[in-house]
């Protein structure tokens, strides 16, 4: 269970880093918000899902 928690936490940290770097770059592109809206929303939804999954797994690990 600890290994699954660590992998999920690593995915959460990696996605957070990708969103912090990627969203401003996507919004600064010439097409901007219109072209990359779906990618930003799906990344944000996955991030929120990982927040809850990491929280739930944390209760099993500690």
Swiss-Prot record:
Q: How does it sit in the membrane?
A: Multi-pass membrane protein
Q: Which Pfam families match?
A: Ycf9 (PF01737)
Q: Which Gene3D superfamilies match?
A: Photosystem II PsbZ, reaction centre
Q: Does the keyword Iron apply?
A: no
Instruction: Kindly indicate whether the keyword Repeat belongs to this entry.
Output: no
The lineage's top-level taxon is Eukaryota
Q: Keywords in alphabetical order, please.
A: Chloroplast, Membrane, Photosynthesis, Photosystem II, Plastid, Reaction center, Thylakoid, Transmembrane, Transmembrane helix
Q: Which GO terms describe its biological process?
A: photosynthesis; photosystem II stabilization
The cross-references to InterPro entries, in alphabetical order and at most eight, read: PSII_PsbZ, PSII_PsbZ_sf
| Predominant location category | plastid
Q: GO CC terms for this protein?
A: chloroplast thylakoid membrane; photosystem II reaction center
Localization terms from the record:
Plastid, Chloroplast thylakoid membrane
Its transmembrane ranges are: 8-28, 41-61
Function in brief: May control the interaction of photosystem II (PSII) cores with the light-harvesting antenna, regulates electron flow through the 2 photosystem reaction centers. PSII is a light-driven water plastoquinone oxidoreductase, using light energy to abstract electrons from H(2)O, generating a proton gradient subsequently used for ATP formation.
Subunit field text: PSII is composed of 1 copy each of membrane proteins PsbA, PsbB, PsbC, PsbD, PsbE, PsbF, PsbH, PsbI, PsbJ, PsbK, PsbL, PsbM, PsbT, PsbY, PsbZ, Psb30/Ycf12, at least 3 peripheral proteins of the oxygen-evolving complex and a large number of cofactors. It forms dimeric complexes.
What family does the entry list? Belongs to the PsbZ family.
Indicate what this protein is called per its UniProt record: Photosystem II reaction center protein Z
Q: Which gene encodes it?
A: psbZ
């Amino acid at each position: 269970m600890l290994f699954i928690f660590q992998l999920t936490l690593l995915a959460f940290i990696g996605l957070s880093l990708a969103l912090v770097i990627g969203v401003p770059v996507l919004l600064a592109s010439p097409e901007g918000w219109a072209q990359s809206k779906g990618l930003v929303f799906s990344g944000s939804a996955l991030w929120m899902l990982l927040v809850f999954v990491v929280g739930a797994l944390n209760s099993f690990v500690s």
